[in-house]
Regions:
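Contiguous, well-ordered alpha-helical segments that form the cores/surfaces of helical PPI scaffolds
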Residues: 33-45, 63-67, 101-109, 165-170, ...
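Glycine-rich, acidic and aromatic/proline-enriched surface loops and short helix-turn segments
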Residues: 1-9, 67-74, 172-176
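Glycine- and acidic
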Residues: 20-27, 47-49, 195-197
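Extended ligand-binding clefts on enzyme/binding-domain cores
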Residues: 83, 87-100, 106, 116-230
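Membrane-entry segments of alpha-helical transmembrane domains in multi-pass membrane proteins
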Residues: 25-32, 93
C-alpha cells in the first residue's frame, strides 16, 4: 500500500525517502540509491508473494529503469541523494559506497525477474557501475565514499564484516573484479554472548546485522548467523 500510494505508476518510479505523518508534512521529495534498490526488491517480492501481478511488477520496474538511465551519475554510480521532482543530485554531491552496493545488489535481483529486453537494460546499468573507483587497493578496503564537490575520495573505510557494507563487498567481488582477499581484510572482532561468540559491529544496530541477509543469508551456526541472533 505504501508503494501504491507514494510511487504511482504515472510517475518516475522513484520512492520517497520518508513520509511524515505527524505533524503532517507528506512525502519527502528526495530519494537515495538504497531507497531505489529496496523499492525494486519490494516490487519483485510483491510479485513473488502474489500481492501484485507480473504485469504490474514489470510496469513498475520499467518506470524506475527508465528514470535510472536518465539520472546524472559519477562513473555510473548514483549520487547519494536526488530531488525526486527535478531528478538532479542534491548538494553537496556525494557518492556513498554502501548505498551503491545496495543498489547494485537490487539491480541484479530486478534483472533476474525481468523479461529479456528489460534484463538487458538492467545489465547495462550494472556494467556501468564502476565500484572499483571506491576501492582502496593499498588498504584492501572500500572507502566510505567520494566527495564529488571536492573531487576527493573519503579517508575512512568500511573495515568490519558485521556491517551493512557486506553487501557492497560481496557484489563488488562478484561483478566488478574486486579481489577475494578483500573479504579477508574485513575485521572480525568478537564478544562473548551467552556462552558463544558474536561479531562486533560499529554501533550494534539491527540494520548492520540484518540488512545483508536480504541478499546473502548465512547458515545458522556460522559466525554471521550466530551474531545476527545474538
Amino acid at each position: 500500500k505504501y508503494f501504491e500510494r507514494f510511487v504511482p505508476l504515472s510517475g518516475n518510479g522513484l520512492p520517497p525517502d520518508n513520509v511524515q505523518l505527524d505533524p503532517c508534512a507528506g512525502a519527502a521529495e528526495r530519494t537515495s540509491p538504497t531507497n531505489i534498490g529496496m523499492y525494486l526488491m519490494s516490487c519483485v517480492s510483491a510479485r513473488e508473494l502474489g500481492l501484485i501481478d507480473p504485469g504490474e511488477m514489470r510496469a513498475r520496474l520499467r518506470e524506475t529503469l527508465r528514470t535510472l538511465h536518465s539520472l546524472p551519475k559519477w562513473h555510473g554510480l548514483l549520487y547519494n541523494w536526488y530531488d525526486t521532482r527535478t531528478l538532479y543530485p542534491l548538494r553537496p554531491a556525494y557518492v556513498s559506497s554502501v548505498d551503491c552496493g545496495n543498489l547494485l545488489a537490487a539491480l541484479l535481483v530486478a534483472r533476474s525477474a525481468s523479461p529479456e529486453e528489460d534484463a538487458g537494460r538492467f545489465q547495462s546499468l550494472i556494467d556501468e557501475m564502476e565500484l572499483e573507483r571506491l576501492y582502496d587497493e593499498e588498504r584492501g578496503l572500500f572507502r566510505i565514499g567520494y566527495d564529488a564537490e571536492k573531487d576527493a575520495p573519503g579517508q575512512s573505510h568500511y573495515d568490519l564484516l558485521a556491517s551493512e557494507a557486506r553487501i557492497l563487498s560481496y557484489v563488488a567481488m562478484a561483478e566488478r573484479g574486486i579481489p577475494v582477499r578483500h573479504w579477508e581484510k574485513l575485521g572480525r572482532p568478537c564478544a562473548r554472548v551467552r556462552g558463544g561468540c558474536a561479531l562486533y559491529s560499529w554501533s550494534g544496530t539491527m540494520f548492520e546485522y540484518m540488512m545483508p541477509f536480504l541478499f546473502m543469508p548465512s547458515a545458522t551456526k556460522t559466525l554471521l548467523g550466530v551474531s545476527a541472533r545474538g
